[in-house]
Each structure stands twice: as structure tokens, then as C-alpha cells.
A protein has these predicted regions:
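Helix-to-loop junction immediately C-terminal to a conserved catalytic motif
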Residues: 49
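Conserved ABC transporter NBD signature motif
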Residues: 57-65
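Conserved ABC ATPase "signature" region
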Residues: 65, 112-127
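ABC ATPase NBD coupling module
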Residues: 66-83
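Conserved ABC ATPase signature
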Residues: 131-135, 139-141
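Conserved catalytic motifs of ABC-family nucleotide-binding domains
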Residues: 152
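Catalytic Walker B motif of ABC-type/P-loop ATPase nucleotide-binding domains
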Residues: 156-159
Length: 210
């Protein structure tokens, strides 16, 4: 298995402990983590990304236990092997689309996918030289996906990627994420409260607060 999440729990100071369902994924497989606002979905995603350390349990990505890594080693591992699609695109508005992707590769010290080839796959190669600040919401979302994929990660995490999209575009974004994950052999985890996309992913786990 490429990704394993086992017996994970986490507690914020003064709050009840949150427990999360176990699951595992091979390369090219996807899971939808579905839950209402406040259920702990984003906490679960942050644990899978190594942005939080679990109170109990562990996340193993390609044989590496994330909680065993710290500081620069963890940052470098995350940059090289985990791609994150945030709910609101984390892009530098003053840079061009291509420059945003090149910056992601530079910071991770990893030569991944060709930015132009990736933009072609996502249907926005014509925007490669455009400043990110001039893009539409849908275009910016695709660039955010491209940025998450540019280092050819082993794990793709998508946090509420369809929350601001209409039905048609929500479906397309999930299909796009699945297709790209399958193409590079990455595990895909989509965290959402959006019931509309439930039918797009075969493996669905409910995340419920205590």
C-alpha cells in the first residue's frame, strides 16, 4: 500500500479527542472523506499531510512514518511527495502561472513534471504567461491543481476543492483530480462536505465529530 492511516486521533488543547477512520490506498486509488463542517475533516487532512502530529496512530506514506520526520526533513519530504490543493488557491498573484509552478519545483528541490505539459493536460496552457491575479476562479483552481501536481507527488490531498463551484464544474474538478492521480500513480484524498461529488469516488469514508 502506498498510503496507510491507522488508529489516528488528535486533540486540540481543552477539546475532546478526535478519532478518524482507518484506510489505505494504493497508487492511483482515491478516497472521499465526507463530513459536515466542524467534523474534523481539515484536521484529518492536516494529519495526513504531516502538518499536525497525531496524539495516537500513524500515517505511513510509501514506507515512511510521517511523525518520525521533523523540521527540515519533514518539510522537504512534504514538498517532494505530497501535493495539496487548498480550498482557496495558495498562489502568488504577481507571478505568472508558469512561474508559480517553477517556484514550487525550486522550493522542493525536485524536478517533477514539465509545467507546460501539465498545464496542457489541465487545459490552461494558454494562460502560462498570465499573472495569476488576472485569472478567473475556475482557472485559478486549475492552476492550484497544477501546482499540487508539478512535483509528481505520491499523495494528493484536496481540501474542499468544489465548495465554490456549480454542479458541472464540481464534477469536472473531481474527475480531473482522479485522472491526474491515476496518470502519475498517486494516492488521492478528497476532503469535502459536498454531497454532490459522492458518486464520483468509489471509496467514501464518513468523518464524524465525537
Amino acid at each position: 500500500m502506498l498510503l496507510q492511516s491507522t488508529s489516528l486521533s488528535f486533540a486540540y488543547p481543552g477539546q475532546p479527542s478526535l478519532s478518524f477512520p482507518d484506510f489505505s490506498l494504493s497508487g492511483g486509488e482515491a478516497v472521499l472523506l465526507l463530513g459536515k463542517s466542524g467534523s474534523g475533516k481539515t484536521t484529518f487532512l492536516n494529519l495526513l499531510a504531516g502538518l499536525l502530529s497525531p496524539s495516537q496512530g500513524q500515517v505511513i506514506l510509501d514506507g515512511t512514518v510521517l511523525s518520525a520526520l521533523q523540521g527540515h526533513r519533514l518539510d522537504l519530504f512534504r514538498g517532494q511527495h505530497i501535493g495539496i490543493v487548498f480550498q482557496k488557491p495558495h498562489l502568488i498573484a504577481a507571478l505568472s502561472v508558469k512561474q508559480n509552478l517553477e517556484l514550487a519545483q525550486f522550493l522542493s528541490k525536485k524536478k517533477g513534471a514539465s509545467p507546460i505539459s501539465l498545464l496542457q493536460d489541465l487545459g490552461i496552457a494558454g494562460k502560462a504567461s498570465a499573472a495569476v491575479g488576472t485569472l478567473s476562479e475556475g482557472e485559478a483552481q486549475r492552476v492550484s491543481i497544477a501546482r499540487a501536481l508539478v512535483n509528481s507527488p505520491k499523495l494528493i490531498l484536496a481540501d474542499e476543492p468544489t465548495s465554490s463551484l456549480d454542479d458541472l464544474h464540481a464534477q469536472r474538478v473531481v474527475q480531473l483530480l482522479k485522472a491526474q492521480a491515476a496518470k502519475i500513480g498517486a494516492a488521492l484524498v478528497i476532503v469535502t462536505h459536498d454531497q454532490r461529488v459522492k458518486s464520483e469516488v468509489s471509496q467514501v469514508l464518513e468523518v464524524k465529530s465525537a
